[in-house]
Structures are given as C-alpha cells and as structure tokens.
C-alpha cells in the first residue's frame, strides 16, 4: 500500500512572546489570519489526504468561517506543550484513516511563509527515506555563547560549521514519530520539535534546504517582516 500524506498544525500555543492580546496564529497579517497561509499552502497540495489543526480545548478565537474554502479538519485536543499537542494530534489522525506507515508533516502555524513548492520539495526529498527529516537552513550568522551568571557577556564564539537552523514542516512516519514522543515523555523529556524526539530514539533525520521566507514569527517586530513578505506575494 502506498503511504499517504497528512499535515498536522499544532495551534494550542498562546504566543506570549509576540506581545499580542490573542494567540499569534489568529493575528491578521497582510489581510488574513496568520493560520490561513499554512492552511492554504497545504490545501494547494492535493496529494495530502488531510490537514489537521490541533487547538486548545478552551480556544475562544478559532473561527472556521475565516478559513472558508480551505480543506482541513479541527480537533480540540491541544495539550500543555507542543509535544503533547502533536502527540494528541497523531492519535487523532487515526480517526481520519491514517496508518502508522503514513507520513505526517508537522508545521508551525507561526511560519506563514510556507509555500506549496517548499512542501513538495520536502516530500520529494524524503518520500523514500527510511527515517524522514526536516526543512532547515544552514546557520549564516556568527554565534556567541553567553557566560553563565553574567550580564550577557560573551564566553566564546561557537563554530557554525555544520550548524543548521531547524524549520518546519518536519516529516516522519506517523508510527515512528508517535512512539518516539512517547519514549521521550517516559524518559521525562519535553522536546521542542519532532526531530528531537526522533533523535532521542537513536535515528538521524535528514536536513532539507528550506527558505528564509519560512521564518517563525515570534517577536512583535516579526509581524512587520511577515506583512512585507506576504503582502508582496498578494500584490504579485
């Protein structure tokens, strides 16, 4: 049986660092909710069986009418952490016919610069891979390590050779990712991305070149950059 493709977008976070009065995935960027751009990118990839959005059980901001015409499903099964939300989402995918050998692409709603071309590039690079992998960018900036207990004084410069900045989507087999997260949880680890769980299980995910436009909107000033990128795309 040919493995199918599913997308999972965890949206249960509060986005506290963004300085917004609401979760950042619902803030307006270039005329649309930030979440819209991720949903639209996966909707444009007809090869996906389903896109599942995981929101908090008490989410008062999500309104499906704001994403009319896009193909996706919603589950109010978000957990206390990203890892918990992703795990709950993986379990929920079974209700949409997903099997352990199917692929899931986990994507941050706070990366509205994702495009169908980037998604397809990731799938094309990994569809025959034994482990899976993630979208990422080689580190271009010089990295400084801060000395502990100082007022942000440099301790030393970190060599950047071989360092990559993780992005999303992160693409793994549903069963492998679920079991890896469960193993990390049982060992007391709350990991910040899916690749970390796979690594914890002893596997080596592959890195696939991403794009600067696929950056994560985190701080208040990031919204202006996202507005410029996405607004330019709409104008074109």
Swiss-Prot record:
Its EC number is 2.7.7.60. The record marks 160, 216 as: Positions MEP for the nucleophilic attack. The keyword Thylakoid does not apply. The keyword Ribosomal protein does not apply. GO terms for molecular function: 2-C-methyl-D-erythritol 4-phosphate cytidylyltransferase activity. Keywords: Isoprene biosynthesis, Nucleotidyltransferase, Transferase. It comes from the Bacteria. Pathway: Isoprenoid biosynthesis; isopentenyl diphosphate biosynthesis via DXP pathway; isopentenyl diphosphate from 1-deoxy-D-xylulose 5-phosphate: step 2/6. It is an enzyme of class 2 (transferase). GO terms for biological process: isopentenyl diphosphate biosynthetic process, methylerythritol 4-phosphate pathway. InterPro entries: IspD, IspD/TarI, IspD/TarI_cytidylyltransf_bact, ISPD_synthase_CS, Nucleotide-diphossugar_trans. It catalyses: 2-C-methyl-D-erythritol 4-phosphate + CTP + H(+) = 4-CDP-2-C-methyl-D-erythritol + diphosphate. The record marks 17, 24 as: Transition state stabilizer. Belongs to the IspD/TarI cytidylyltransferase family. IspD subfamily. Catalyzes the formation of 4-diphosphocytidyl-2-C-methyl-D-erythritol from CTP and 2-C-methyl-D-erythritol 4-phosphate (MEP). NCBIfam families: ispD. This is 2-C-methyl-D-erythritol 4-phosphate cytidylyltransferase. It comes from Paraburkholderia phymatum (strain DSM 17167 / CIP 108236 / LMG 21445 / STM815).
């Amino acid at each position: 049986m040919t493995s199918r493709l599913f997308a999972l977008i965890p949206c249960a976070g509060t986005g506290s660092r963004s300085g917004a009065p609401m979760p950042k995935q619902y803030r307006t960027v270039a005329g649309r909710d930030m979440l819209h751009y991720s949903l639209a990118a996966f909707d444009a990839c007809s090869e996906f069986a389903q896109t599942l959005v995981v929101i908090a059980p008490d989410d008062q901001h999500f309104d499906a009418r704001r994403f009319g015409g896009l193909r996706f499903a919603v589950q109010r099964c978000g957990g206390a952490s990203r890892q918990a939300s992703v795990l709950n989402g993986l379990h929920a995918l079974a209700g949409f016919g997903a099997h352990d050998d199917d692929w899931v692409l986990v994507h941050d709603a706070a990366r509205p610069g994702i495009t169908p071309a980037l998604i397809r590039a990731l799938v094309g690079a990994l569809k025959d891979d034994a482990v899976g992998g993630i979208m990422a960018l080689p580190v271009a900036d010089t990295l400084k390590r801060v000395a502990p207990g100082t007022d942000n004084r440099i301790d030393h410069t970190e060599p950047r050779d071989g360092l990559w900045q993780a992005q999303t989507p992160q693409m793994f087999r549903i069963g492998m990712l679920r079991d890896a997260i469960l193993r990390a949880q049982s060992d007391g680890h709350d990991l910040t991305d899916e690749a970390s769980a796979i690594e914890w299980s002893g596997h080596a995910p592959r890195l696939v070149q991403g794009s600067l436009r696929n950056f994560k909107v985190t701080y208040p000033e990031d919204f202006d950059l996202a507005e410029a990128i996405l607004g330019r795309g709409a104008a074109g």
